[in-house]
């Protein structure tokens, strides 16, 4: 598996080689720094820790800065990728060219927050009649039972805070890679708002 940290720029559309219009998401990947390497002998598993984004010294605590060795300055974002397929060393820089032999990606990000929402928006309830004397429009209706069990079961769909969850979209096709601009385009949409941090990994359910 190969992974990188990126930033969602936004969506646009391009024509493919057949002439069909295709929606794509543009993701910017600045050079990721290899912060640490973990092996099976010491940690029980093998992984690579990547970092991105400079962090001012006044915003860095000594325990946090202690995990950066050598000439590597403290970085804002850290992400650990297990079973890394590429041979790397601490201090190396990785860009979008790492995905040149990859066709599909799994992308993880924090979805857009919607705030407190009702059952119609959050769970797709149909609601009640809009007219003819109805006094039941957007309510959830009954959520409980009779004397037995005398309560509402857990995980009953109710109003509540919606969105702002960790979401992974699998098997997004890579449409274009531009190493000069540090940009990668994938087919379809990606979770999160503009400028959101996204984690890109080679798809686990496909060979490449």
Swiss-Prot record:
**Any Gene Ontology CC annotation:** cytosolic large ribosomal subunit
Q: Which Pfam families match?
A: Ribosomal_L3
What GO MF annotations does this protein's record show? rRNA binding; structural constituent of ribosome
- Spell out the Polar residues composition-biased ranges: 144-158
Similarity comment: family membership:
Belongs to the universal ribosomal protein uL3 family.
Identify the stretch(es) annotated as Disordered. Answer: 134-159
Which biological process annotations from GO are given for this protein?
translation
Query: What gene does the UniProt entry assign to this protein?
Result: rplC
Sorted alphabetically, the keyword list is: Ribonucleoprotein, Ribosomal protein, RNA-binding, rRNA-binding
The job of this chain, per UniProt, is described as:
One of the primary rRNA binding proteins, it binds directly near the 3'-end of the 23S rRNA, where it nucleates assembly of the 50S subunit.
Which residues does UniProt assign to the signal peptide? none
Q: What is this protein called?
A: Large ribosomal subunit protein uL3
InterPro entries, from UniProt?
Ribosomal_uL3, Ribosomal_uL3_bac/org-type, Ribosomal_uL3_CS, Transl_B-barrel_sf
Q: What are the top taxonomic ranks of the organism?
A: Bacteria, Pseudomonadati, Spirochaetota, Spirochaetia, Spirochaetales
How does it associate, per the subunit comment?
Part of the 50S ribosomal subunit. Forms a cluster with proteins L14 and L19.
């Amino acid at each position: 598996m190969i992974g990188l940290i990126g930033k969602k720029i936004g969506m646009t559309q391009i024509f493919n080689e057949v002439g069909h219009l295709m929606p794509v998401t543009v993701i910017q990947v600045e050079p990721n720094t290899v912060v640490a390497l973990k092996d099976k002998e010491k940690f029980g598993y093998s992984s690579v820790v990547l970092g991105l984004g400079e962090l001012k010294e006044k915003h860095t605590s000594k325990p946090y800065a202690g995990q950066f060795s050598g000439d590597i300055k403290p970085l804002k974002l850290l992400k650990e990728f297990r079973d890394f397929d590429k041979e790397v060393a601490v201090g190396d820089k990785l860009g979008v060219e790492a995905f040149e032999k990859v066709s599909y990606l799994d992308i993880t990000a924090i979805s857009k927050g919607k705030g407190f929402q009702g059952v119609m928006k959050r769970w797709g309830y149909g609601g009640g009649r809009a007219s003819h004397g109805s006094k039941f429009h957007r309510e959830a209706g009954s959520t409980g039972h009779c004397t037995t069990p005398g309560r509402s079961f857990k995980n009953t769909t109710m109003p509540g805070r919606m969105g702002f969850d960790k979401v992974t979209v699998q098997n997004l096709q890579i449409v274009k890679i531009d190493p000069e601009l540090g940009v990668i385009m994938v087919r379809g949409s990606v979770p999160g708002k503009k400028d959101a941090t996204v984690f890109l990994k080679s798809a686990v359910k496909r060979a490449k």
